[in-house]
Amino acid sequence: MTTAFYPGSFDPMTNGHLDVLVQALNVASKVIVAIGIHPGKTPLFSFDERAGLIRRSLSESLPQRAGDIAVVAFDNLVVDAARQHGASLLVRGLRDGTDLDYEMQMAGMNRQMAPDIQTLFLPAGTASRPITATLVRQIAAMGGNVSAFVPGPVFQALQAKHKA
């Protein structure tokens, strides 16, 4: 049984994240979606909100695999958190060459610190390549329609957040 660790801020989860998660489930029997907690950052959604949105999005999009996915928080090194959760794979999504350059550096450092944990790069699908959580937050804050970029529960939460 292979466990994959999929770290990110997921603020909010996008269709791009969901695309990578579906691919990861084709490789690993269990995927841990790991929300990074950074004390110096102020996310739009709290950890509990992000975890709930991810769980609701997954129950709608992947109901048959719900038992194969866990959502956790981490505030330490990715490789240490992955090891704590019994993961042997780190999942990283790639949208373009810029992502690849950055992720290759990170993979190299992670391999030095944890040679037992492999990094798995998964390319974003064509439709999700331009999507970033930052752009989704900005568009939603300006009243734009982001329904094509995020799962339904996330869209509803963004609408509620920006009407408040």
UniProtKB/Swiss-Prot annotation:
Biological process, per Gene Ontology: coenzyme A biosynthetic process
Pathway assigned to this chain's UniProt record: Cofactor biosynthesis; coenzyme A biosynthesis; CoA from (R)-pantothenate: step 4/5
GO cellular component, one term: cytoplasm
Keyword Ion transport among record annotations: no
Amino-acid positions noted as binding ATP in the UniProt annotation, renumbered to this chain: 9-10, 17, 93-95, 103, 128-134
UniProt EC number: 2.7.7.3
Record site: Transition state stabilizer: 17
Top EC class, one word: transferase
Keywords assigned by UniProt, alphabetized: ATP-binding, Coenzyme A biosynthesis, Cytoplasm, Magnesium, Nucleotide-binding, Nucleotidyltransferase, Transferase
Protein family (similarity comment): Belongs to the bacterial CoaD family.
NCBIfam families cross-referenced by the UniProt entry: coaD_prev_kdtB, cyt_tran_rel
Its biological purpose: Reversibly transfers an adenylyl group from ATP to 4'-phosphopantetheine, yielding dephospho-CoA (dPCoA) and pyrophosphate.
Protein name per Swiss-Prot or TrEMBL: Phosphopantetheine adenylyltransferase
Organism listed in the record: Sinorhizobium fredii (strain NBRC 101917 / NGR234)
